[in-house]
Amino acid sequence: MAGKREKRQTTIFLLAFIVLFIASIIACVVRAKRMQKVEYADHMEDVAVTVDGESYTFRDIAFYLAYKEQTTQEQAKVYDLEHTNEFWNLHTNGSFIRIEAKDTAMDMAVHDVIFYRMAEEEELSLSEDEKQYVENKADDFWNDLEEEGQKRLGVSKGEIDDTFIHMGLAQKAQQLLADTNGVDYREYNVEGSMYQDVLDEHTYKINEKLWERLDFGNII
């Protein structure tokens, strides 16, 4: 009788061990999948961020991602021309430069969405000189990408032109708000002391599931 009881206990123990072992394997697989990098090109039409209830895809914020990659890569070349990844992977101010640059790209995108909407509400428009200026800036950015970068970014020149027009209007709305409140324009930049007050009046939600895994630094 005692032998049967011991055998039953052993069987139960083994079954419990097997269940726990399988569960741990599944947990490891799920964790690894969550940490696996995702390619920008595979998720261009997926939502990257929602601002005040309106969704914006990775395609919509393509310029900001490319711009921050460009500027960060330029800094990386100054830091170590032959081993630029050394700079990208630096840990400073409590964060990795790669992550900091990516988050800044998102912050810029959200900032411009908010101010562009202000421009629409105020019915602002660009003068002919302002239009020419943003067109030239768009051309410069597009040409700097070169053919390979343009292909990898996956958006058309027309989409980039539209983004720059929106940015120009956002900047005009930012200047109007600064003038109205008698402060310097820069106070409403992403890191400006008064921008947080503006941001607090809006809601935004980042698609963290994809954003955290985005292979930033290898888009263009």
Would you name each region that the model predicts?
Residues 103-106:
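Alpha-helical scaffold segments that flank or form the walls of functional sites
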Residues 116, 145, 180, 201-206:
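Short secondary-structure junctions and interdomain/linker hinges
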Residues 1-97, 193-220:
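Short, low-structural-confidence N-terminal segments
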